[in-house]
């Protein structure tokens, strides 16, 4: 989950809370101390990883970052910095909470070459379905977390010869984002990173190495 995501606590144990995310109804566990009271976010992180500062000064950088699409409540602004909770972040690393990109995947190259991590959803590692969901979330649109649920959610089926930018190609347990008639991008487990590939090459490679054929291609808009 990301900083600023809202959730409901389902149950508590000594050190853990079982929660359900409001974003996609995903259920999981977090450490009790890892959350704060509900706040209404005013801004969201628009860079891959935004540095956090103790004071509104570039000399007071902490060893912490907020990942892309995290949400904050801006308490005040001082120079080029914005205060959230008791920390500071550069204003240039944020967008207003209602901001939307004209092209939902326009910032996708932020994750190019980044580490593949099953279950990951941030700059330290991300999986294929999170790469899709994250950009819908950033643009204030719903998208399920898992590949099978994304396949069911996006209804409009497309033939390979009719693909367009922002279409999604689905295999069993895997999804890729179409960038153009010839290119796609995906968080690719076997290579352990987010890669741009030729579409035909990717289809053949996945069929050869994983024995998987395309299940469907879906339009997202």
Predicted regions, residues:
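Short, well-ordered loop/turn sites that connect or cap secondary structure elements
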Residues: 1, 66, 162-164, 169-170
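Boundary regions of SH3-family modules and the immediately adjacent low-complexity/disordered segments
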Residues: 3-8, 13-14, 20-51, 57-64, ...
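Conserved "cap/hinge" positions at secondary-structure junctions
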Residues: 11, 76, 172-173, 188
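Hydrophobic residues embedded in beta-strands of well-ordered beta-sheets
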Residues: 17, 81-82, 176, 184-185
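Short alpha-helix capping/helix-loop boundary micro-motifs
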Residues: 52-62, 151-160
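Aromatic- and glycine-rich peptidoglycan recognition patches
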Residues: 94-96, 148, 156-157, 180-221
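Catalytic cysteine-centered active-site loop
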Residues: 115-163
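Catalytic nucleophile-His microenvironment captured as a short glycine-rich beta-strand/loop
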Residues: 168, 173-181
């Amino acid at each position: 989950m990301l900083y600023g995501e809202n959730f409901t606590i389902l149950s508590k144990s000594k050190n853990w809370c079982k929660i359900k995310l409001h974003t996609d109804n995903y259920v999981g566990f977090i450490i009790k101390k890892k959350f704060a009271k509900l706040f209404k976010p005013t801004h969201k992180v628009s860079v891959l990883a935004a540095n956090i500062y103790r004071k509104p000064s570039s000399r007071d950088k902490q060893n912490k970052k907020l990942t892309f699409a995290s949400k904050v409540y801006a308490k005040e602004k001082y120079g080029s910095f914005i205060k959230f909770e008791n920390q500071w972040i550069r204003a240039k690393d944020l967008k207003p909470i209602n901001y939307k990109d004209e092209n939902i995947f326009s910032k996708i190259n932020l994750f190019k070459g980044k580490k593949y991590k099953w279950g990951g959803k941030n700059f330290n590692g991300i999986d294929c379905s999170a790469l899709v969901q994250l950009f819908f979330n950033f643009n204030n649109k719903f998208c399920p977390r898992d590949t099978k649920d994304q396949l069911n959610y996006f209804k409009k089926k497309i033939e390979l010869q009719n693909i367009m930018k922002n279409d999604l190609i689905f295999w069993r347990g895997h999804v890729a984002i179409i960038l153009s008639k010839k290119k796609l991008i995906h968080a690719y487990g076997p290579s352990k990173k987010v890669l741009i590939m030729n579409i035909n090459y990717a289809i053949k490679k996945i069929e050869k190495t994983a024995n998987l054929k395309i299940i469907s291609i879906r339009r997202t808009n």
